[in-house]
Amino acid sequence: MMDFGFSALTLARMQFAFTVSFHFIFPSLSIGLASYLAVLEGLWLRTGKPLYLDLFRYWVKVFAVAFAMGVVSGIVMSYEFGTNWSVFSDKAGGVIGPLMAYEVLTAFFLEAGFLGVMLFGMKKVGPRLHFTATLMVALGTFVSAFWIISVNSWMQTPTGFEMSPDGRFLPGPSWLAIIFNPSFPYRLVHTVIAAYLTTAFVVGAAGAWHLLKAPGNLHARKMFSMAMWMAALVAPVQIAAGDAHGLNTLEYQPAKIMAMEGHFQSHAHGAPLYLFGIPDDARQRLDYAVAIPNVSSLVLKHDWNAPLPGLDTIDPAKRPSVAILFWSFRLMVGIGLAMLALGLWGLVARWRGKLYEWRMLHRAALVMGPSGFIAVIAGWTTTEVGRQPYTVYGLLTTAQSASPLAAPAVAASLIAFVLVYFAVFGVGTWYIFKLLATPPHAGDQGLAIEQGKPLRSAGITPGPAQGEPHHQPETVE
């Protein structure tokens, strides 16, 4: 039997973890890139410097590939709700179904309406109309994140619902209570900032790569400079947002925080912060622990000696996996601190006038290029594993949510997904690397290379020749 010794439930969880992790790589880039493209085009319109237009055309190609792969991989997860998690869909569909439909009716239609203009309309509409299309696509990516995060947050902190006699979740008197559930604002801010940081480090890595090869490339200098500003300014904000999110989680999902901190036992007079340790879920202890006394109480309660309960106060059947949470959380935090360190290093280099000369800084930025993706996956692993053993926290368990499938059937689909994903998205990822390997240059035509065709459709909208900003000499600050 092709089940690899796992139950159907475990295989279904593995399959969803694989597909959702693979999927979120692309939205975390497209959300940030859409806003970055809007900034670049806005700067071009304001300053008239063709360098910004060149960078827009350079990155819009990467955005197109990432956006397409994000859409395709996202559709797969919708089908998984019906195949592997049909009981969950049946019981919670009354709440999450409309929320996901709202995403289609708002974000998807907004993106679909303006994406073609953004990608292919630079020579067909006026620059300000094109900029409006870019802004609408950026807004669409944010609105999409809004609805998806609302769905996930409701599963984490469910409010505003009613239970039917047969155990189904139904909308209560106010949809606002469902949408703006207790963890939603914190998770939305944390997720969107993570997407911006992810994009900043991808842009910074690309700029660093080309600076290492051609230090005088003005386009690479501008990319790198903008990315380092983002790292220095946004990384501290993300750390603060993460701290606020953690305090909210402590209030509504204390078992998740206990597992993240490695607190198997309660601490009556201040809990230590464990920097390192090997969690032993079976024996409920943390081996080889390296701790700083009382700091966990200081961070979580803002009181050096505040008591903190441990997992010994939670029913063993309702505890998440400490081993996974302990390390995924530390991986996320460690990368966040590394991002902050690189941003501060960039500030020092800028202050000394060496931002484009310190090759060690460029190499470090290159190494940190994929760090945002790793941190995002680690963060979502912390969020989702910490919710276990529930799909709807405290109300519907994961075991109760699964479809009545045989393990070999789920294993076969898991293998198929792995093979297809690595083949299809492997090619897409390779193509993105190919695009980034080509240095940005003046006169980049983006996706709008069309010979012998009209520059724009018939109508009264001014063409680019009438609305194009006056070009000014290039400088990199």
Predicted segments, located by residue:
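Polytopic transmembrane helical bundles with strong interfacial aromatic enrichment
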Residues: 2-477
